[in-house]
């Protein structure tokens, strides 16, 4: 559940697997960790070698997938990070920087400055996720960190991700599918990819006229692009990354905590209608910041309700959250590039504090 590494997350959470390795290009380590109540880490791209790892879109470099560890505890993530030596990996992969991983125990949480946000300005997070992030902020404050409110720049950043990932017009997707039947979750994506440009433009305008601005823009950005437009997207990605750095520097931030997703785990078969709910996860793979997820709490029965709205995406999110009481809720911890040690140290501090809470989503088996 939650992404391409969802099977591994479910196996870890249920005690069938001690740990696992996932890949993340849009949240496929972090979202399954959040949905299943385990811990996961998406390192900086090429912190671990990606040589030998298959990618869904070979040659697409605007947004890159990265392998990373998944486990029941943050200590296990730290162990896995220690087990992979970049100074050896770089001998077989020139993309890997020879920077040693120092370990979370070398990081002093007290004195760190952490930004916090519960709404990315694109899609509001479920009340349970907002509560979890606030609780994580309290726990880090108790550990000696300074936690301040942070407003992330460019709330519609995910459209750049979608524009880049679809720049081949769906050719790679079509080739991969071959004659296979399309699963329900991919049907809308395939339908839009196959839609002629003029038809897509008309549909987008109609959606915009009905007030569905987010879906209208989705239709506008998806599809084949000439090289010059792809280069412009790549430059925009770089500028967005610099803006994020500047925003962190303005506040003197060492890290940020925020929701990993806009909602808890969704019912089977509904994810295809909720692609835009991934904005919190897309953000930090697009910007190439290391990011991890640590379990904090569970959904309360008064947190299944969103404010009433006419927006289609918000309505779909609200419908999928019905019956979510008791589901695990994680918090995303983001650090500066190559500071996986700092990310895990903050995750460990949150984990230590949250374990004493009544709603902590403990996995059914003890760590191995």
Language model segments and positions:
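Short pre-catalytic strand/loop immediately N-terminal to key active-site residues, enriched for Gly-Thr
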Residues: 1-3
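Serine-dependent amide/ester hydrolase catalytic core
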Residues: 108-109, 118, 155-157, 172-309, ...
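Soluble, non-transmembrane catalytic domains of enzymes that act on hydrophobic metabolites at membranes
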Residues: 125, 132, 153, 158-162, ...
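Structural helix-boundary/capping segments
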Residues: 14-123, 134-143, 220-224, 231, ...
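Amphipathic alpha-helical segments in well-structured domains
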Residues: 38, 130-134, 166, 276-281, ...
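Glycine/Thr-rich phosphate-binding loops of Rossmann-like dinucleotide-binding domains
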Residues: 29-30, 124, 262-267
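General small-molecule cofactor/ligand-binding pocket signal
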Residues: 146-151
């Amino acid at each position: 559940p939650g992404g391409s590494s969802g099977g591994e997350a479910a196996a870890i959470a249920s005690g069938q697997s001690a740990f696992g390795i996932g890949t993340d290009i849009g949240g496929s380590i972090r979202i399954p960790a959040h949905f299943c109540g385990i811990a996961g880490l998406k390192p900086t791209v090429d912190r671990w070698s990606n040589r030998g790892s298959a990618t869904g879109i070979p040659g697409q470099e605007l947004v890159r997938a990265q392998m990373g560890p998944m486990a029941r505890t943050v200590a296990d993530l730290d162990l896995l990070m220690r087990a992979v030596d970049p100074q050896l990996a770089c001998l077989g992969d020139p993309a890997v920087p020879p920077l040693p991983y120092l370990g979370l125990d070398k990081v002093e949480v007290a004195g760190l400055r952490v930004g916090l946000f519960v709404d990315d300005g694109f899609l509001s997070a479920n009340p349970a996720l907002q509560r979890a992030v606030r609780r994580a902020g309290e726990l880090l404050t108790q550990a000696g960190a300074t936690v301040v409110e942070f407003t992330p720049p460019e709330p519609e950043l995910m459209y750049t991700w979608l524009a880049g990932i679809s720049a081949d017009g769906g050719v790679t997707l079509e080739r991969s599918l071959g004659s296979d039947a399309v699963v329900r979750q991919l049907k809308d994506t395939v339908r839009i990819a196959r839609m002629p440009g003029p038809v897509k433009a008309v549909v987008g305008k109609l959606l915009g006229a009905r007030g569905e601005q987010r879906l209208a823009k989705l239709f506008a950005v998806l599809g084949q692009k000439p090289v010059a437009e792809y280069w412009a997207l790549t430059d925009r990605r770089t500028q967005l990354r610099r803006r994020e750095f500047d925003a962190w520097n303005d506040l003197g931030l060492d890290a940020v905590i925020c929701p990993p997703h806009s909602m808890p785990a969704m019912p089977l078969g509904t994810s295809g209608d909720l692609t835009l709910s991934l904005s919190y996860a897309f953000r930090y793979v697009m910007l190439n910041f290391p990011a991890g997820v640590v379990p904090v709490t569970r959904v309360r029965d008064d947190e299944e309700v969103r404010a009433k709205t006419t927006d289609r995406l918000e309505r779909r999110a609200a419908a999928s959250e019905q019956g979510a009481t008791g589901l695990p809720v994680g918090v995303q911890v983001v650090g500066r590039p190559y500071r996986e040690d700092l990310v895990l140290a903050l995750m460990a501090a949150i984990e230590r504090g949250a374990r004493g809470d009544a709603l902590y989503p403990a996995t059914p088996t003890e760590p191995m």
